């Protein structure tokens, strides 16, 4: 079969609420995730029978069995009992690594979609979702994209029919990293006394999010975007001067709708009603962002993953 390629879009968290601890040790979450048009690109070409290989435009990214692209390919072969299937995969990396933007998860989800097509496996959406959920907490969302309520570890999805599609000014200091396990551990240490423990309590919070002002704004049922909640930001920002500085910079120019950290960070974003407003803010902030070591991108939120 001739070569194929698919885009692997980034995401941001418009809401990240840590509800409590699950029996399996993971945190129970209530989130709103949003796909952006910033994307990696994954291509596949033929290879000798049984051979899987991955190359990447960014030499910092591991291309061995620890990479979710390779894990996804191997999971597909196991699921179908087809060890002879082969692929030469190449990734063009545009999403910053380790940034809280689900770049790795999106790459893994895209590998599932791409290889399902390339190998003509004809797996159903449900089968792909189950494989995605096994690969990682954000992979199931990245498989579908758009704007979604995400519950459980992030694998339980409810699509939101949104009217608002804000522009996004995204910033990240490439010299700063945040360990996701560390962030969740700190959250448990600092906020754990308020954790919920019963399924009834979890469901009450899920329902509150479904009926929240944020959802009303996304559906254009109210004009004012409320402050965005990220429980990990509450604990990470006080420990990270770069995150604090970035949030302050984003809030200082262009009258953003709201500013927040994405996921466990360290990526930060500001929302604007349209691209011209985001571009004006980027222009105004560019000197200060450069002075403080931040890379920056203007992105658009999208209604679907646009594979």
From Swiss-Prot:
GO terms for molecular function: 4-(cytidine 5'-diphospho)-2-C-methyl-D-erythritol kinase activity; ATP binding. It catalyses: 4-CDP-2-C-methyl-D-erythritol + ATP = 4-CDP-2-C-methyl-D-erythritol 2-phosphate + ADP + H(+). Its EC number is 2.7.1.148. One of its GO terms (biological process) is terpenoid biosynthetic process. Pathway: Isoprenoid biosynthesis; isopentenyl diphosphate biosynthesis via DXP pathway; isopentenyl diphosphate from 1-deoxy-D-xylulose 5-phosphate: step 3/6. ATP binds at residues 96-106. It comes from the Bacteria. Pfam families: GHMP_kinases_C (PF08544), GHMP_kinases_N (PF00288). The active site is at residues 11, 138. Keywords: ATP-binding, Isoprene biosynthesis, Kinase, Nucleotide-binding, Transferase. InterPro entries: GHMP_kinase_C_dom (IPR013750), GHMP_kinase_C_sf (IPR036554), GHMP_kinase_N_dom (IPR006204), IspE (IPR004424), Ribosomal_Su5_D2-typ_SF (IPR020568), Ribsml_uS5_D2-typ_fold_subgr (IPR014721). NCBIfam families: ispE (TIGR00154). Belongs to the GHMP kinase family. IspE subfamily. Catalyzes the phosphorylation of the position 2 hydroxy group of 4-diphosphocytidyl-2C-methyl-D-erythritol. This is 4-diphosphocytidyl-2-C-methyl-D-erythritol kinase. It comes from Synechococcus sp. (strain RCC307).
